[in-house]
């Protein structure tokens, strides 16, 4: 019987493979000659440790196998690597635009691994075309960025192994950062900001009640004083609304006291206009503020009040 699928254009076949699990896409290489290397032209890979184990028939994922899967895909644009334990991995791609790293464990003697000068452990990112980097449950002290990235958006979620962390790789061209800040890792806020000296926009979601003494004891990040323009702060709803609001305004105070030019947005879930006005009054008691616009409202209903400040720091209110 004639193989009608194999007669389809390469572009259409690549689209079909893109919508298959990566493990299934790679298996098509055993089909007739035309399929042998076709999977390498698929612009997306989703690598999960358990699937890799089945595919390569190894007890543990091989560093070499992972690196080969990535480097032998010449048009790869989207890559997600999940639930992987390796000694060393280098993500090298000239075409990669989006990289997601979830639940990494770097194995080594006594499970105490850091990326040294010999480059034998940890993760190295060499992706000059990268535009988006997402890090979740990942030991940040174990990776470095080799190539110069021209423009990138970064999302950090639930990262662990902070106790040994002193600084992140520097992202000189990072302009927008979306970050989750948990009570137990309050000291990470200035570390996030210090790693991005030219940051212009921050989307910050608070989980729990940040410890301001840990934040305030760190040096003021350069980006707050030179480049920050927009800050959005959202507090995950908690039972103790008064304590939640206090935490949110304290974080806002830290940013406002150190920023030179700022537009601030606070999302207050399930609050009334009177509550928004009360929060504004607290903000106005902050010293040395230099913001030009404040938006306060409820995200769910898209209710927002805007406050615009003039040079004399008088403000006018309007609905947005």
UniProtKB/Swiss-Prot annotation:
Lineage: Eukaryota, Viridiplantae, Streptophyta, Embryophyta, Tracheophyta
UniProt-listed SMART domains: FBD
Pfam families, sorted: F-box, FBD
Organism: Arabidopsis thaliana (Mouse-ear cress)
Protein name: Putative FBD-associated F-box protein At3g60710
Sequence ranges assigned to domain F-box in this UniProt record: 2-48
InterPro entries according to UniProt: F-box-like_dom_sf (IPR036047), F-box_AtFBL13-like (IPR053781), F-box_dom (IPR001810), FBD (IPR006566), FBL13/AtMIF1-like (IPR050232)
Domain FBD residue range list: 212-268
């Amino acid at each position: 019987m004639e193989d009608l699928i194999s007669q389809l254009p390469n572009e259409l076949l690549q689209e079909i493979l893109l919508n298959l699990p990566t493990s299934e896409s790679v298996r098509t290489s055993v089909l007739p000659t035309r399929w042998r290397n076709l999977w390498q032209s698929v612009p997306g890979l989703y690598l999960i440790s358990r699937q890799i184990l089945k595919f390569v028939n190894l007890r543990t994922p091989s560093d070499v196998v992972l690196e080969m899967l990535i480097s032998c895909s010449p048009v790869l644009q989207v890559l997600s690597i999940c639930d992987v334990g390796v000694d060393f991995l280098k993500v090298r791609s000239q075409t990669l635009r989006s990289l997601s790293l979830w639940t990494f464990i770097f194995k080594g003697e006594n499970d105490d691994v850091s990326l040294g000068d010999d480059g034998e452990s940890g993760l190295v990112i060499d992706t000059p075309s990268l535009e988006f980097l997402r890090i979740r449950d990942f030991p940040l002290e174990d990776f470095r960025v080799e190539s110069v990235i021209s423009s990138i958006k970064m999302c950090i979620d639930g990262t662990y192994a902070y106790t040994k962390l002193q600084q992140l790789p520097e992202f000189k061209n990072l302009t927008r950062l979306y970050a989750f800040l948990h009570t137990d890792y309050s000291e990470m806020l200035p570390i996030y900001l210090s790693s991005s000296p030219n940051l212009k926009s921050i989307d910050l979601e608070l989980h729990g009640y940040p410890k301001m003494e840990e934040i305030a004891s760190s040096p003021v990040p350069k980006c707050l004083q030179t480049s920050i323009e927009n800050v959005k702060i959202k507090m995950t709803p908690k039972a103790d609304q008064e304590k939640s609001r206090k935490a949110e305004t304290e974080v806002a105070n830290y940013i406002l006291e150190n920023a030179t030019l700022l537009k601030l947005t606070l999302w207050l879930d399930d609050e009334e206009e009177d509550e928004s006005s009360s929060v504004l009054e607290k903000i106005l008691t902050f010293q040395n503020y230099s913001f030009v616009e404040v938006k306060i409202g409820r995200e769910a209903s898209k209710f927002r009040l805007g406050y615009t400040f003039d040079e004399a720091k008088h403000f006018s209110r309007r609905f947005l």
